[in-house]
């Protein structure tokens, strides 16, 4: 199985890469960052996946500056929302699986119980809305 992890330079991407490296199973993994795959450019996404085949796409990339997302709404939306939609279409076209990591910011924080994946979202800021 060929696996690509997008977002290798972020906190989550580095953590996943460290786990894969420790298990010595990285021979089927490709780790890419912004330099290799710019998620702000749909044509770049298409071009990359037209030249590379993967069975599994793990998206750890994200615009994570919560406060700055209020000012850079378009960029946050492009990376956290529109690029994910594009990756989903690419995965479907290539018959690959897609794992996308979200955030608890999609919830408003008012629940007294831990949130479940099936709970209704209610983001309270731009960052949460883009995720």
Over which residues does each language-model region extend?
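N-terminal Rossmann NAD(P)H-binding glycine-rich loop of SDR-like oxidoreductase domains
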Residues: 2-22
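SDR active-site strand-loop-helix element
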Residues: 6, 32, 57-61, 98-103
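Adenosine-cofactor binding site in Rossmann-like domains, unifying the SAM/SAH pocket
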Residues: 25-47
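NAD(P)H-binding glycine-rich loop region in Rossmannoid oxidoreductase-like domains
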Residues: 42-79
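Active-site segment of SDR-like NAD(P)-dependent oxidoreductases
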Residues: 64, 104-107, 121
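NAD(P)-cofactor binding segment of oxidoreductase domains
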Residues: 71-99
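Conserved catalytic-site region of short-chain dehydrogenase/reductase
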Residues: 101-114, 126-127
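Active-site Tyr-X1-5-Lys
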Residues: 122-131
């Amino acid at each position: 199985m060929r696996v690509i992890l997008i977002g290798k330079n972020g906190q989550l991407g580095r953590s996943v890469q460290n786990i894969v490296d420790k298990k010595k199973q990285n021979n089927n993994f490709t780790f890419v960052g912004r330099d290799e795959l710019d998620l702000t450019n749909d044509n770049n996404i298409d071009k990359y996946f037209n030249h590379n085949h993967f069975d599994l796409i793990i998206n750890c990339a994200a615009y994570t500056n919560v406060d700055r997302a209020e000012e850079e709404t378009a960029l946050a939306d492009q990376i956290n929302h529109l690029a994910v939609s594009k990756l989903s279409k690419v995965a479907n076209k290539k018959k690959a699986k897609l794992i996308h990591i979200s955030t608890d910011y999609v919830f408003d924080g008012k629940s007294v119980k831990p949130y479940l994946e099936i709970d209704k979202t209610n983001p309270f800021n731009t960052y949460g809305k883009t995720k």
